Every structure is written in structure tokens, then in C-alpha cells.
A protein has these predicted regions:
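Preference for protein termini
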Residues: 1-162
Length: 162
């Protein structure tokens, strides 16, 4: 899996009214269906047990690695306490190329979550360790550093509404 052209969507956009990180993700032939990767999902769940289901119930379509990246980036932010709920993976016209969009509350946190999600996927593929507690701590620390405080945030939000 290769991630290219990561960009921040800083307002209402094609995908959502919320801010989001958009990435172009290239998957190898084997990564187009994670069911074809023996033991991958079990290793992934061992590394990140709180990860949401990789496929909705009743959906029997192949789940590409890009979708795993999407759910991992969203899940890492949510576990770190960020108020995020939206993500989407859409195939492009080119086989194996996907657009991955993940909501963020703070841009730096969203970008870091995408990087950490890549590391998580790579660790699950390689059957290597992944420091989940460290990753969540990193995201929480960054979120606290860049997020506006409650009173400043209220002032900024009121100004934006005007």
C-alpha cells in the first residue's frame, strides 16, 4: 500500500461539511481484498482491538487495504478522544487506486492519525509490534497542543458564525 497526495479539506467539501484529510492510496493486487491475506485481520485486531468492523454485516464485497487504512485512522482519532465520525473510501477509475477521506477535528491530528494508521497496517502485514498506547498518547498530546481552549474556541466559533 502506498499513500500519496495527502491534502487537508478545510471546510465543506465533496465528501462532508466537516474538515477532512484526503489521501490517494494505491493497493497491490493482494491488498485489493484483505481476505486474501492470511491472518491479516486477526493480527490487525490483536494490535488494535477497538477497530470497528472492516465490513458492515451483509456486505460480501472485497475489503481493500485502503478501507482498513480509513477505519484505522478514524478509529485512532476516536480512541484518542477526538470528536470524529466520518470517513469514506472510494475507488477511482484506475484499478487499485482509492480516495480515502477521514474527518479530523485538528488538521495536524488528522495527518498524524493517517501516518499512524499506515504504521498499524504495515505492522499487521509484517506481523510486527505496534505501540497502540504510544500512538494514542501521541495523538492526545498533539490534540491538546493545537486545539483551542473552551473559551477561545467559543469566541472563534461565534466569530465564524457572524
Amino acid at each position: 500500500m502506498e499513500v500519496s497526495r495527502v491534502r487537508a479539506l478545510r471546510g465543506p467539501n465533496l465528501w462532508s461539511h466537516d474538515t477532512a484529510v484526503e489521501a490517494i492510496v494505491s493497493c497491490t493486487t493482494q491488498e485489493l481484498d484483505i481476505a486474501q491475506l492470511p491472518g491479516f485481520e486477526a493480527r490487525l485486531r490483536a494490535l488494535f482491538p477497538q477497530l470497528s468492523p472492516l465490513q458492515p454485516l451483509g456486505n460480501y464485497n472485497a475489503a481493500p487495504m485502503a478501507q482498513v487504512l480509513e477505519l484505522a485512522a478514524l478509529g485512532l482519532q476516536a480512541q484518542a478522544g477526538c470528536p470524529v465520525t466520518f470517513s469514506r473510501t472510494t475507488p477511482t477509475l484506475e484499478t487499485g487506486i482509492f480516495q480515502v477521506v477521514v474527518e479530523y477535528s485538528e488538521e495536524a491530528v488528522g495527518r498524524l492519525a493517517l501516518e499512524l494508521a499506515q504504521q498499524l497496517c504495515r505492522a499487521a502485514l509484517d506481523d510486527a509490534p505496534f505501540d497502540l498506547a504510544g500512538a494514542l498518547h501521541q495523538l492526545q498530546e498533539l490534540d491538546e497542543d493545537v486545539r483551542l481552549g473552551p473559551s477561545t474556541g467559543a469566541i472563534v466559533n461565534a466569530a465564524v458564525v457572524r
